[in-house]
Structure formats: C-alpha cells, structure tokens
UniProtKB/Swiss-Prot annotation:
InterPro entries: DH_E1 (IPR001017), PDH_E1_Alpha_Subunit (IPR050642), Pyrv_DH_E1_asu_subgrp-y (IPR017597), THDP-binding (IPR029061). Coiled coil: none annotated. Mg(2+) binds at D187, N216, Y218. Thiamine diphosphate binds at Y109, R110, G156, V158, D187, G188, A189, N216, H283. GO terms for molecular function: metal ion binding; pyruvate dehydrogenase (acetyl-transferring) activity. This is Pyruvate dehydrogenase E1 component subunit alpha type II, mitochondrial. Residues 1-17 form a transit peptide. The lineage of its organism: Eukaryota, Metazoa, Ecdysozoa, Nematoda, Chromadorea.
Amino acid sequence: SNIFKGPTVGSSVVAMSARLASTEATFQAKPFKLHKLDSGPDVNMHVTKEDALRYYTQMQTIRRMETAAGNLYKEKKVRGFCHLYSGQEACAVGMKAAMEPGDAAITAYRCHGWTYLSGSPVAKVLCELTGRITGNVYGKGGSMHMYGENFYGGNGIVGAQQPLGTGIAFAMKYKKQKNVCITLFGDGATNQGQLYESMNMAKLWELPVLYVCENNGYGMGTSAARSSASTDYYTRGDYVPGFWVDGMDVLAVRQAIRWGKEWCNAGKGPLMIEMATYRYGGHSMSDPGTSYRTREEIQEVRKTRDPITGFKDKIVTAGLVTEDELKEVDKEIRKEVDAAVKQAHTDKEAPVEMLLTDIYYNTPAQYVRCTTEDVLQQYVTSEEAFKALSK
C-alpha cells in the first residue's frame, strides 16, 4: 500500500499517500459520540490540496471579516446588535462544504459567516452592517438579518429558526427533493420549547432535517453546565438519533454533514448533531465576554483548539501546502477585507424611501380592496427601488 501513518497533529493522526503526498491526504477525526445509532461517520477524512486551500481561505476570510466588523462597531458605524462568529469558523465552512445544490441552511443571529459562504462578498456583508444601500439586503437587515441562495437567514429571536427549518424540510419532502435543511442553533436555544415541537413533527413525518447545535459553551453569559441539566446535546432528541462531533475540525464537520445527508436521503428522518466549538468574543459586541469566564480560558482555546491554526498545521505537515502559499492567501484576504471596510465607510446609506419596500412579496391585482396608489407603493421591492435610485 502507498498509504503510511504520518505525524500526529493536535488530536489528528495524518495518514499520507507516498505517491500523492503533495495533492491529497487523509486525517483522523476525534471519535464521534453516538446516540441511538449503531454506526456513525467514518473517522478517516480525505482532503485534496484544492479543497484544503478553499477551506483555509474561507475560514481565514470569515475571521478577518469579523475582526473588521468588530472594529466598525467600536467606531459606532454599526447600529443595533452585532454577533461575531470568531472561533466557530470550522462549523460553517465544514457544513457548507458538505452541502449540495438544493440543500438549505437556516441559523440564528450569528450569521455573517454563513452570508459570506452563501454568495455575498465581504463588502456586501460589511456594507449591510453599516446600513449602506450596497449591503446584502440594501442596508435594511443589519447584523442579524442577512440571506443568500438557499440560506434563510439570519433570525433575531432565539430558537425562532427551529420550526422554520423544519418547515423547509417539510417542503423538500413534499416536493420529493433529495435535499436536506440544516437547522442551526446554539446551546442556549436547546432549552427552547419550539425545538421539541419541531423534532416531534420531524420524526413523526421523517423529515430530511439536520438539527445542529453549535455548542460554544455559553448562552449569552450563562455556561452550558448552569443552564442545562444535561449538556450532552446530541442526546436531546430522545427518539431522534444523534451524534457529537468536534466543531473545531473543519474536516470532521464536513464528514458529519455528509453522513447526515446520506441518513436523511435514505428516508430515515431527522438527526440531532452537536458541534463542540467556542466563541472568542462575547455573546454580542456589548458583552466583553470576560465576566463569566477567564481570559486564560480563552487564550487556552486559542492556543490548543483554534480551528484555523489547527487546520493550517495539519495541511502544512501533510505536505498539501507550504507556509508561503498560505501567506499569499492571507495577503489577498487582507486586501479584500480592507477594500470592503472602505466601502462600508463610504458607500451611500439606504435612503428613507427604502422603508416602504418589501412590505409584501408581490403586487396584487388592482381590483383588490385598498390598492390605492399610496398602498401600492409599499409593494415595491428593494431591488426595484435600488434601480430607480441609481438612475
């Protein structure tokens, strides 16, 4: 065989091909903890150089973009709430890597990374934060309400996305689509009643939904241990099978979702997946994040479990990429984010007229009551208004 056991990087053993060492490699994930499953995802994870570079670029872009978002908030350019994804990048990037055309995702308010991965350039995300007309939703959504193709947001209410994701999965089954809906929430939202109502319906009708708990350890300022009688969130579904995955390992996350998709596509119904991750910042920008945990705890995670540093060490050690290649990637990311920050400062703000757009999905026929000219104005879409204002 041309496969041999390479060095251990963090908790992962590198298995490399002697013949293809520079273009592909295999790593081992931490064991997946299972609930009501006879077997789970394979711990052996294969990755090509092309994919490795893409995942690194995406994670690093999200990290730098969120740093820029935090700085814009401190400059008082961002109004309202602002929840950053720093530390959790491997979750979104790994999940997106496993998704196929037609698959959907829906999350809560920590949505900047998902918006970027769903097709919005960094500039669109940052311009949305500063209320610019060039933002993801023309400056009207702000930090918590951003969207993309098959990405349903961005929801500002804790747990509100859980029944919505279940509904998206219901539509997929009704239309006989071979797709899944990834429904994301944090550990703090696992105690919300709508999660259990949703899981009951999903299991009753065997819906293709993956309930994913991004367990970053804290719901606002409350640790998981103080808020939950059981912190094994992957077992919360009771009659819904589930498993635990290391959410700081982008390849393990990808492996988990690929396996989950196969489960759903086989008609077996929902799964509950817990991704163990960590957020470096506070719950939001108004939370310093150090009153309920120590700075030493944060630094320890950065030092031993950081998703970007850990992945970088793996792929460099395996010979997939060089330090110089990654430095070039970092350089390009800096340029992109710096240019986006300038746009977020200087692009036109959304005008007051935009408040009247997107009130309804489409324009009703004239014979409908109350469709006077002033009411019809409310049926204009943001896109139509943007085009008119750009003339």
